[in-house]
């Protein structure tokens, strides 16, 4: 796909979603390539209550959404903006998320609901990389419906694999959101080989608030797989005087972007690590960094840390690199 700038659309709650003390606003970033984009609310001033969903690749272009939950009084009295940066096209887009004002007539109108606003939205998400590549795990495709109204809570899901309907999906109980709407999730457990062979998974959603069903599809990205290169980097000497030090795992030159990076200490899984999203490099491969924070004492006594990587292009889909303090250092 060629480099394409995103389009940005503000998402505002329906009339029923603005009556509480909190309101959830959204920003839909659609039709861009390649990854990544960054989304900031009020240029970064709004950071709590922000939830940015993973990007989804459809028909060669990415779509991503971000939401922020703020007090209703903030939205009605202050400007709320969504800023989207797309480095590949040097695009910087800003959208104001504006409250809908009451119509002057008839006087019974509380707010004017545009026909295209306040309806449920549908998102589809791929299986986790580790679930797909480890035969002992069960991969699943997930379909998420947001902004389901209290008045019309029934959501019907239909699932298809290569346009053949399947009936094995599971729908989870409705989750009430802070803005008074509901979130509904349906998951379809899939066969490892169906995803790896490029089969298309489709989620079809119907609800009385929708004029017609919404369909979302997803499949494994096409293209030749490239093997990740894994490098471990010890903590800098300047950190040794602190209580915690940072270990780094750099993973480069992989394709597709779907990858799992985890850490272990002396063979036990660690939790205190952060991964960047995969970033598209100049050669059309991806790279990412993972940072693990550890106690300085643990590092100094020679505990062995392992960066563990799962990717489809690796032999047996798995590799790992150890990192420990060299004696005398």
Swiss-Prot record:
Q: What GO cellular-component annotations does this UniProt entry give?
A: immunoglobulin complex, circulating
Keywords in alphabetical order: Disulfide bond, Immunoglobulin domain
Provide the residue span(s) of the region labelled CH2. 114-222
Which positions form S-S bridges? Answer: 27-82, 143-203, 249-307
The record ties this protein, via Pfam families, to: C1-set
Q: Where is this region: CH3?
A: 223-329
Q: Which GO terms describe its molecular function?
A: antigen binding; immunoglobulin receptor binding
Question: Which residue ranges does the record annotate as region Hinge?
Answer: 98-113
**InterPro entries the record matches:** Ig-like_dom, Ig-like_dom_sf, Ig-like_fold, Ig/MHC_CS, Ig_C1-set, Immune_Resp_Modulators
Q: Extract the ranges annotated as region (CH1).
A: 1-97
Can you supply a Gene Ontology BP term from the record? antibacterial humoral response
Q: Which PANTHER family would you find in this protein's record?
A: TAPASIN
| The name this protein goes by in its record | Ig gamma-2C chain C region
- The organism encoding this protein is Rattus norvegicus (Rat)
């Amino acid at each position: 796909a060629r480099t394409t700038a995103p389009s940005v659309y503000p998402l505002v709650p329906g009339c029923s979603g603005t009556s509480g003390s909190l309101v959830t606003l959204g920003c839909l970033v659609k039709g861009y390539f390649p990854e990544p984009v960054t989304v900031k609310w009020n240029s970064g001033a709004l950071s709590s209550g922000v939830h940015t969903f993973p990007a989804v690749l459809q028909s060669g272009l990415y779509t991503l959404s971000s939401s922020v939950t703020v007090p209703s009084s903030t939205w009605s009295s202050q400007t709320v903006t969504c800023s989207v940066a797309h480095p590949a096209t040097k695009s910087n887009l800003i959208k104001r998320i504006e409250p809908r004002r009451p119509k002057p007539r008839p006087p019974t109108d509380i707010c004017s609901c545009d026909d295209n606003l306040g309806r449920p939205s549908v998102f589809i998400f791929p299986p986790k990389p580790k679930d797909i590549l480890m035969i002992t795990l069960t991969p699943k495709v997930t379909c998420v419906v947001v902004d389901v109204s209290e008045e019309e809570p029934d959501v019907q899901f239909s699932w298809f694999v290569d346009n053949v309907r399947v009936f094995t999906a599971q729908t989870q109980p409705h989750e009430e959101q802070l803005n008074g709407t509901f979130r509904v999730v349906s998951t379809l457990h899939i066969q490892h080989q169906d995803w790896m062979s490029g089969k298309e998974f489709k989620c079809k959603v119907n609800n009385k608030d929708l004029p017609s069903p919404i369909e979302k599809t997803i499949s494994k990205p096409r293209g030749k797989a490239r093997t990740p290169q894994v490098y471990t980097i010890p903590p800098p000497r300047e950190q040794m005087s602190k209580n915690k030090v940072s270990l780094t795992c750099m993973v480069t030159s992989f394709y597709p972007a779907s990858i799992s990076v985890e850490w272990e200490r002396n063979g036990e899984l660690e939790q205190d690590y952060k991964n960047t999203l995969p970033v598209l490099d100049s050669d059309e491969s991806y790279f990412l960094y993972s940072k693990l924070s550890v106690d300085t004492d643990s590092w100094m006594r020679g505990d062995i840390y392992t960066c563990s990587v799962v990717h489809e292009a690796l032999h047996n889909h798995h590799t790992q690199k150890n990192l420990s303090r060299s004696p005398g250092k």
